[in-house]
Swiss-Prot record:
Belongs to the universal ribosomal protein uS4 family. Keywords: Ribonucleoprotein, Ribosomal protein, RNA-binding, rRNA-binding. Gene3D superfamilies: Ribosomal Protein S4 Delta 41, Chain A, domain 1, RNA-binding S4 domain. HAMAP family: Ribosomal_uS4_A. This is Small ribosomal subunit protein uS4.
Length: 200
């Protein structure tokens, strides 16, 4: 088990380090999610492996009509639905069909990008590590944090961050062309109103 005082690896390296198909697949995931290195993939794979291992164990117990197995399955699904990895209506087959991308989709870095708070996955990582992002009002600097569904809507820029200003270049770059046109029109309208008041 090891001494709880010391940190232990939360992942295991591939058994066959030079498999081309696996390397190609990992490289695609690395680029898609803007990950720092493959250890972040392996951590998610270790988590997924643990979930699926528990699900297979529960399936065997359910076949043996174990009364407590159904309750444990419900607790597992409830825990996964809390992180929006599965819905609360999910079944054992849904648990067994999970992929590593289902886990990676719930990382703070991925959600910041999907919420249009960053121009890319890599920029999302940078904003988080530099303290520009808050979750439920608290600054978070861990890109790999799994976000609970109840806190997803609370993800925002830190109020004292320069990026919280809508005129910041990053905020302007995030606007769609239609939003930019609308914003420019509003600025022009406000400027003309100010000019009219001064003339009076």
């Amino acid at each position: 088990m090891g001494d709880p005082k010391f940190h232990h690896k939360k992942y295991s390296t591939p058994r066959h380090p030079w498999e081309k198909d696996r390397i190609d697949e990992e490289n695609k995931i690395l680029v898609k999610y803007g990950l720092k290195n493959k250890r972040e993939i392996w951590r998610s794979e270790a988590m997924l492996s643990s979930i699926r291992s528990q699900a297979r164990y529960l399936r065997a117990r359910l076949r043996a009509s174990d009364a407590n197995a159904q309750k444990q399955l419900e607790r597992m699904i409830k825990r996964l639905s809390r992180y929006k990895i599965l819905s609360d209506k999910a079944t054992l087959d849904d648990v067994l069909s999970l992929t590593v991308e289902n886990i990676l989709d719930r990382r703070l870095q991925t959600i910041v990008f999907k919420k249009n708070l960053a121009l890319s996955e890599k920029q999302a990582r940078q904003l988080i590590t530099h303290g520009h992002i808050t979750v439920n009002g608290r600054r978070v600097t861990v890109p790999g944090m799994l976000v609970e569904a109840q806190y997803e809507d609370t993800i925002a820029y830190y109020e004292n961050s320069p990026i919280a200003n809508e005129l910041h270049p990053i905020r302007q770059a995030l606007l769609s062309p239609a939003e930019r046109v609308k914003e420019e029109a509003e600025k022009e309208a406000a400027a003309s109103e100010d000019g009219g008041e001064q003339d009076e």
